[in-house]
A protein has these predicted regions:
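Beta-rich carbohydrate-recognition and catalytic domains
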Residues: 1-55, 63-110, 114-160, 165-186
Length: 186
């Protein structure tokens, strides 16, 4: 079990977090289950790696890739944002992928990861109001360190939390009827 989460000692949030000032803290926890977790503060290491003013672990799902857990983060540097996947093994940072930036100015948010045909696949909700029920998500794929391609994927998506498992995408369903949910094959 691996967890990534944020906390704050004060009143700072994502939009007013600053690398050289008060900022969101980043934590990892890992163990064999909820009653057996070890914790480590990754704030300094992740801010240094990414050059971030703010970052948080996305609420999408993750996978193991090449023997490490892939953890997706939304990273803000000034006014620019991107997704950054970092790799953890037993509370240690063991690698990172290149920054993932959406084509054409699309801002990426909550990201679920999967491994499909040996490639790491990122399935991203769009950031901001346009991402909630916009009818598109952003897909990107690569070897786990570099992104080889990306595209907008049109589907009826309410912009909510979602999960990929292999080539299956599980999400709440239409914006006006979430009760049943949907499973969509990529």
């Amino acid at each position: 079990l691996h967890l990534a989460f944020a906390s704050t000692d004060g009143r700072v949030g994502y939009m007013d977090s600053c690398a050289d000032g008060e900022r969101l803290r980043t934590w990892w926890a890992w163990g064999s289950g909820p009653d057996d977790l070890a914790y480590v503060d990754m704030t300094d290491e992740l801010y240094e790696l990414t050059g971030a003013d703010a970052l948080f672990a996305t609420s999408g799902g993750t996978v193991a890739h090449d023997g490490a857990v892939a953890l997706p983060y939304v990273v803000r540097v000034g006014d620019a944002t991107h997704v950054r996947v970092v790799y953890a093994r037993a509370g240690r940072l063991v690698g990172a992928a290149d920054p993932l930036v959406g084509d054409g100015g699309v801002l990426l948010d909550e990201t679920t990861l999967s491994v499909w045909d040996g490639r790491l696949v990122a399935n991203c909700r769009l950031q901001g109001f346009e991402g909630r029920g916009s009818g598109v998500r952003y897909l990107a794929w690569g070897d786990g360190r570099t992104w080889e391609g990306g595209c907008l994927w049109e589907l009826d998506d309410p912009g909510c939390k979602a999960r990929m498992v292999g080539d299956l995408f599980v999400h709440p369903g239409r914006r006006d009827a979430r009760a049943g949910g949907e499973v969509v094959r990529l």
